[in-house]
Structures are given as structure tokens and as C-alpha cells.
Amino acid sequence: IACNAFIMLVSLCFSRRVVGAKRFDAMKPHERTTWHTNLCTFWPAFAVTAYALPAIATFSGKSDSFVSDVSALTSKACGLSIGYMTWDLGVILARWDDQVVAYGGKGALYLFIVHHVFSIVLWPYALMRHLCAYHINYFLVSEVTNFNMSLRWILAALNMSNTKLY
């Protein structure tokens, strides 16, 4: 949560200068909010994966068993991911109207909330009981896809959808 707060603060202070005042000011208010929150998705995309991927590679249990030891790498990846999801859930609830627009409606937003709440509650419970560590790592590795989605949104918001990077 602290990393997200720091990134949000840096984004609030410097995004307009880095992107350019004209381009940044052309965004709608809900787009500016989404801009800052999307920047917060980059660090967990890589930090969580940096812990979860080696946890999969070094997993010593049986991949078809639900019971296994939980590595320190899995615990760290889970903690980082839960911290990020808690932050994201807080942003969704605090900026509800902006987020409804950003997610394309309440239905998609409710689905996202359910995903976050289930993960926040069930992953730590399962890991504390030595359940599904191998499988949870696969969900944690999927966090890396946030990078692509957020980068695509940022490029579209900057009217850069005709670039090779997009």
C-alpha cells in the first residue's frame, strides 16, 4: 500500500510536467484519476511476478496436490499482490463514479471487486493452511498482464494509439 501511495504522489506531482501540460490537461477528470491509478499497476506487475515465477520453478511438491509447503517467495508475492489489491479496492470505493466510467459500467466494476475481495480473503487463508500454493502462484504470475493493459490505456489516453508501442 505504501508503494502505491508513493507512486500516486509522484504521479500527481510530475505527470503533467512529464507528459506535457497540453496533453495532460486535455484528459477528462476521470481519465486523470485513471491515469494515476494505472501508473500504480506497473510495480506489482513485475514485483509480484519476480517472486511468484521462481516459486513455481523451485516448487518441490506435487503439482497435482492441493497440500504443500509454502515458500517464502510465494508468501512475499501474495503479500505484495494483496497490498496492491487492497489499494486498488480503496481507489475503486473512494472514486466510485470515476471508476464506473473507467471500467465501462457497474457490471465490470462489481466483477473486479468480487475478484479482489475473494483474492484478499482466500489466498492468505489457503497459504496459511498450506493449500494450493502451486496454483496460487499461477494467479500471482498473471499479474504481469497488468503491464500490457495499463500501458495500452495510457497510450490511448495520450492519443498514441497509432504508434508501434501501442
What function would you assign to each model-found segment?
Residues I1-S142, N146-M149, W153-Y166:
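Membrane-helix and juxtamembrane interface regions of eukaryotic multi-pass membrane proteins
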